[in-house]
């Protein structure tokens, strides 16, 4: 998007330390050239990348190398784009960074001439080489459409000039239009309404920066809210434009303010007398402009020019003489300096080569008395493809020049050496074809003579040097990785053809493995795979490495119990935009996070999103995410709040964890270190469940034939549910775990009736430890008595029948006690209900209730929050009690209305709860000074807990609103109800704490008779 800001200097071979990888020596260096004559030029160009290391190229050359060869080497490298057809439009500019002195370098100049003529004028480090588009075709708008790379490069060049020279001078309206056009072009995958989201706009401001699109002066003059609204409105106008349309719209808009296709020089025409004019040179020819109000007058067309000569005058001035066909004398132009005359001469000569029939240079050396420069060795006229082939062959022959600048990242002293000999690797069958070449199965013989099965990645012979660097980038990253769940690098063969040798895993890709074995793979194994990949990602997170392509296609199966993460080709070196352009099959849109699609931002948080999608793939046995959508529709679905549905076999707690990873705000997603802990817990739980199910299936009690008189089964006892773990778990706050039936109390040996606490004393039962929940009293085979005769079987059945009757009697007795306790609670909480009850339960009916007439009433769950009876006190003028009851009523209103209200009205019922909570806390604060100091700590702690409960309720409300139209809507509503219930229970606890303090302070009174 912009060029490199630092000076681009020419450095000697022995002093260069490239920031990223070795230089790309596209220019052929003869073997017999002395080392002192070899140069490395650092040439800057424009790019979309934010990485400064992507915006320049190091070119190795000699003092005899021509400028045209340097330009060609950059164009052939593919660094600025593929398939360049208008190569003659490019030129090389030498700029002095401190004085803005500019010299356009003629293609036939040599590096030695540039050094002797220009670089000696200033310090070497103050010069910079820039690749520029200087010569445009006549109808450049249409011509550039056929060469997309040149079109985008010219756009980047104009954008850079606009931001540096014109942005502060144009009107606010034009600056807003041009900035939004660049926004639309740069973030081409962003939906039209993306900037309407506050989080998206904040991400644009903080992570990308508005300075890249809009002038600072404009941002300072406008208020932030006003500026944001203007951007959103203007962006909507260009939301439907494609990239090329944005570029053309930018050209047309900027052309109304500045001349984008021509250069203007202030000079004098020598025609008997001197006339000061503005000389305009562009695709339409050489024209003069005497005033701003008049139209330019054509002086000459490029087809008419036959010679160009520069002559120095006194006092640093110079004369440019143009020989024009049919004219009696040459056109003489007087300039203020020789450098300006030479720049004009290069511009005119370039247009003559582009538009004229003569492809050589028309510039005549003053020192050679009319000898034209085209008598020098001609510029190679081969097309780019022939030139590409010629240079590739030359570079492969002289491959020893790579050794002159070692890559420090590939050779670290003391580290393992990854170079292997080609004769030690034997290739067998082809496993598949990658982006850069084929992948083979092979055998590697190490230095100990051991034979190791390996996979060998190869690079195509016709691959450009730039693509070879990208191919090698995977090995550069992998050689520094050491983790049991990351693919291991065996070695690298850097000589042509380049090979990367890695461990071979016989089970292949995880996606194919899941499809083949989906009938035999169990849930614990699938969770184990996810846990292992999560550990690998936590390792990458610790070394600040972003993978950017986490999917089952890039995971290999080492054994049925071990998987390994691979394919690090995109981890750091390949630019974001290149990955979008690779091919349809490699587009990762359906795995990407919203900020990666919208803004091309790849961070650890975006890797967390992709990892959750990968978990979804694993639990779906290799299905592609969003297979029912096209790539272009995915971001719209994500923006609406929709997420991937829960796979059929996915545990609910694991799916809840996935949804946390798919939070729209990257900062709210968990880190990989946290995910490892959560997945470890889930894996442990799923494994214990599987073990219990397998044990129950293996050891079943013997079937005993019962007599015909006892065919009717006894009533099924009630089943206490699994107690929730502490809410400090990361998986999902206040998540209602769904425990399989095998772990519930339906098995008689899980929790004996004697051990089951009644609702009255359950409050004093110590909490169950998380792992103790799964410790069942499993029945072993020797626990069963095998009857030896029919009579003995009948006796066993009678004993079992008596035991079952005792259990039922005990449970029915507990139900009577529960019913009495429940009525006492109702009387205390709402006296009106008890007064309106016209049919109280009589003792006679209670006695008759022991006869089983229907299914027993289930006692409260073990995990439920039981509420103790309210103290029997005089509630006259008790504001705390009154406010607690009002708050509970507000919570009940929320519970009853939530399913009927539209999402935008959730805030009304939640606000009602908040107002009542404020009244409650206010009444407690008024009473607090009269209570003992020893009781205040507990009361104040409960008040803080209530405030936290309200904040949690608000968060759940917002979550429910965001997911109102998604498949997560009902789950979010349940979480909202859970949060409101917790708030009501804590309010009751606050009332109990206040009552206890009032009793201690003798402020409580019994109720009046």
From Swiss-Prot:
User: What biological-process terms (Gene Ontology) are attached?
Assistant: actin filament organization; adaptive immune response; angiogenesis; blood vessel endothelial cell migration; bone resorption; cell adhesion; cell differentiation; cell surface receptor signaling pathway
Q: What is its main location?
A: cytoplasm
Instruction: List ligand-binding residues for ATP.
Output: 431-439, 457, 503-509
Entry keyword Phosphoprotein: yes
The annotated active site, in chain numbering, is 549
Q: Which reaction does it catalyse?
A: L-tyrosyl-[protein] + ATP = O-phospho-L-tyrosyl-[protein] + ADP + H(+)
Activity control, as annotated, is: Activated in response to stimuli that lead to increased intracellular Ca(2+) levels; this activation is indirect and may be mediated by calcium-mediated production of reactive oxygen species (ROS). Activated by autophosphorylation at Tyr-402; this creates a binding site for SRC family kinases and leads to phosphorylation at additional tyrosine residues. Phosphorylation at Tyr-402, Tyr-579 and Tyr-580 is required for optimal kinase activity.
Give the EC number(s) under which this enzyme is classified.
2.7.10.2
Modification Phosphothreonine occurs at: 765, 842
Q: Where is this region: Interaction with TGFB1I1?
A: 801-1009
Q: How does it sit in the membrane?
A: Peripheral membrane protein
Q: Where is this region: Focal adhesion targeting (FAT)?
A: 868-1009
Q: Which residues form the FERM domain?
A: 39-359
Tell me the ranges covered by the Protein kinase domain, including all copies.
425-683
Q: Which Pfam families match?
A: FERM_C_FAK1, FERM_M, FERM_N_2, Focal_AT, PK_Tyr_Ser-Thr
Q: Please list the residues that carry the modification Phosphotyrosine.
A: 402, 579-580, 722, 834, 849, 881
- Where is region (Disordered) located? 702-725
Q: Which residues carry this modification: Phosphoserine?
A: 361, 375, 399, 762, 839, 866
- Which CDD domains does this chain map to? FERM_B-lobe (cd14473), FERM_C_FAK1 (cd13190), PTKc_FAK (cd05056)
Cellular compartments per GO CC = apical dendrite; axon; cell body; cell cortex; cell projection; cytoskeleton; dendrite; focal adhesion
Expression by tissue, per the entry, reads: Highly expressed in pulmonary vein endothelial cells, lung and brain (at protein level). Isoform 1 is expressed at high levels in the brain (hippocampus, cerebral cortex and olfactory bulb) and poorly in the spleen and other tissues, whereas isoforms 2 and 3 are expressed in the spleen and brain (highest in cerebellum).
**Stated role:** Non-receptor protein-tyrosine kinase that regulates reorganization of the actin cytoskeleton, cell polarization, cell migration, adhesion, spreading and bone remodeling. Plays a role in the regulation of the humoral immune response, and is required for normal levels of marginal B-cells in the spleen and normal migration of splenic B-cells. Required for normal macrophage polarization and migration towards sites of inflammation. Regulates cytoskeleton rearrangement and cell spreading in T-cells, and contributes to the regulation of T-cell responses.
PANTHER family of this UniProt entry? FERM AND PDZ DOMAIN-CONTAINING PROTEIN FAMILY MEMBER, NON-SPECIFIC PROTEIN-TYROSINE KINASE
Q: What is this protein called?
A: Protein-tyrosine kinase 2-beta
């Amino acid at each position: 998007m912009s060029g490199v800001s630092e000076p681009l200097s020419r450095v000697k071979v022995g002093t260069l330390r490239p920031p990223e990888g070795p230089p790309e020596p596209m220019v052929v260096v003869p073997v017999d050239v002395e080392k002192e004559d070899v140069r490395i030029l650092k040439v800057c160009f424009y790019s979309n990348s934010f990485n400064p290391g992507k915006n320049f190229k190091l070119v190795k050359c000699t003092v005899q190398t021509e400028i045209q060869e340097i330009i060609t080497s950059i164009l052939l490298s593919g660094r600025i784009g593929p398939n360049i057809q208008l190569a003659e439009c490019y030129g090389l500019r030498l700029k002095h960074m401190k004085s803005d002195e500019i010299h356009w370098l003629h293609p036939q100049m040599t590096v030695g001439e540039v050094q002797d003529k220009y670089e000696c004028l200033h310090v070497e480090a103050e010069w910079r080489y820039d690749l520029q588009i200087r010569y445009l075709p006549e109808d450049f708008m249409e011509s550039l459409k056929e060469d997309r790379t040149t079109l985008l490069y010219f756009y980047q060049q104009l954008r850079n000039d606009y931001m540096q020279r014109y942005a502060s001078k144009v009107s606010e309206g034009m600056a807003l239009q041009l900035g939004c056009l660049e926004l639309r072009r740069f973030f081409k995958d962003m939906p039209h309404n993306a900037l309407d989201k506050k989080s998206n706009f904040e991400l644009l401001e903080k992570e990308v920066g508005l300075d890249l699109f809009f002038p600072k002066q404009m941002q300072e003059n406008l208020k932030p809210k006003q500026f944001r609204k203007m951007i959103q409105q203007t962006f909507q106008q260009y939301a439907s434009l494609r990239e090329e349309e944005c570029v053309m719209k930018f050209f047309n808009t900027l052309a109304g303010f500045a001349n984008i296709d021509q250069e203007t020089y202030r000079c004098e025409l020598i025609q008997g007398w001197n006339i000061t004019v503005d000389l305009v040179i562009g695709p339409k020819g050489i024209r003069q402009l005497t005033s701003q109000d008049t139209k330019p007058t054509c002086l000459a067309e490029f087809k008419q020019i036959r010679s160009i000569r520069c002559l120095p005058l006194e006092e640093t001035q110079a004369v440019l003489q143009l020989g024009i066909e049919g004219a009696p004398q040459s056109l003489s132009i007087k300039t203020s300096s020789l450098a300006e005359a030479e720049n004009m001469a290069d511009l005119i000569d370039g247009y003559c080569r582009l538009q004229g029939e003569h492809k050589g240079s028309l510039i005549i050396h003053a020192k050679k008395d009319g000898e034209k420069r085209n008598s020098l060795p001609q510029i190679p006229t081969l097309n780019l493809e022939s030139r590409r082939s010629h240079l590739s062959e030359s570079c492969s022959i002289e491959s020893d020049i790579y050794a002159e600048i070692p890559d420090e990242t590939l050779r670290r002293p003391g580290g393992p050496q990854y170079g292997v000999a080609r004769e030690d690797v034997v290739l067998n069958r082809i496993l598949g074809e990658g982006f850069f070449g084929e992948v083979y199965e092979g055998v590697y013989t190490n230095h100990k003579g051991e034979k190791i099965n390996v996979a060998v990645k190869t690079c195509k012979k016709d691959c450009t040097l730039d693509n070879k660097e990208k191919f090698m980038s995977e090995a550069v990253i992998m050689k520094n990785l050491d983790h049991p769940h990351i693919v291991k690098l065996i070695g690298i063969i850097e000589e042509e053809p380049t090979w990367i040798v890695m461990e071979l895993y016989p089970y292949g890709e995880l996606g194919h493995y899941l499809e083949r074995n989906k009938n035999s793979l169990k849930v614990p194994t699938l969770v184990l795979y996810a846990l292992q990949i999560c550990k690998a990602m936590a390792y990458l997170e610790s070394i600040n490495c972003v993978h950017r392509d986490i999917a089952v296609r890039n995971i290999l199966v080492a054994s049925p119990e071990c998987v390994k993460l691979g394919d690090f080709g995109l981890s750091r070196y390949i630019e974001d935009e290149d990955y979008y352009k690779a091919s349809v099959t490699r587009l990762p849109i359906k795995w990407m996070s919203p900020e990666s699609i919208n803004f091309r931002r790849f961070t650890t948080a975006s890797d967390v999103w992709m990892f959750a999608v990968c978990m979804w793939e694993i639990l779906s046995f290799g299905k592609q995410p969003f297979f029912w959508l096209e790539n272009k529709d995915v971001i719209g679905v994500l923006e609406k709040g929709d997420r991937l549905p829960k796979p059929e076999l996915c545990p609910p707690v694991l799916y809840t964890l996935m949804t946390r990873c798919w939070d729209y705000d990257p900062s709210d997603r968990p880190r990989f270190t946290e995910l490892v802990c959560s997945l470890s817990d889930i894996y442990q739980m799923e494994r214990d469940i599987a073990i219990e199910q397998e044990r129950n299936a293996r050891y079943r009690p013997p079937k005993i034939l019962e007599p015909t008189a006892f065919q009717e089964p006894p009533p099924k006892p009630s089943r206490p549910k699994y107690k929730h773990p502490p809410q400090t778990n990361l998986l999902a706050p206040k998540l209602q775990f769904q425990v399989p039936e095998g772990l519930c109390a339906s098995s008689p040996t899980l929790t004996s009736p004697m051990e089951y606490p009644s609702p009255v004393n359950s409050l004093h039962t110590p909490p169950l430890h998380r792992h103790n929940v799964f410790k069942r009293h499993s029945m072993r085979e020797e626990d069963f008595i095998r009857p030896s005769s029919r009579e003995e079987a009948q006796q066993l059945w009678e004993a079992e029948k008596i035991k079952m009757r005792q259990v039922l009697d005990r449970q029915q007795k507990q139900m009577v006690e529960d019913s009495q306790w429940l009525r006492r609670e109702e009387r205390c909480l709402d006296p009106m209900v008890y007064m309106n009850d016209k049919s109280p339960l009589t003792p006679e009916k209670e006695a008759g209730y022991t006869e089983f007439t229907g299914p027993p009433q289930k006692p409260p769950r073990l995990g439920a929050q039981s509420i103790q009876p309210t103290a029997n006190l005089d509630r006259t003028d008790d504001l705390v009690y009154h406010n607690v009851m009002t708050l509970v009523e507000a919570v009940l209103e929320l519970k009853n209305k939530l399913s009927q209200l539209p999402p935008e009205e959730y805030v009304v019922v939640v606000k009602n709860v908040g107002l009542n909570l404020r009244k409650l806390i206010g009444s407690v604060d008024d009473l607090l000074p009269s209570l003992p100091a020893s009781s205040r700590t507990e009361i104040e702690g409960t008040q803080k807990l209530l405030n936290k409960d309200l904040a949690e309720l608000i968060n759940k409300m917002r979550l429910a609103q965001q997911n109102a139209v998604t498949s997560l809507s009902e789950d979010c509503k349940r979480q909202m109800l859970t949060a409101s219930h917790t708030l009501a229970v804590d309010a009751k606890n606050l009332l109990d704490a206040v009552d206890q303090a009032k009793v201690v302070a003798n402020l409580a009174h019994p109720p009046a008779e």
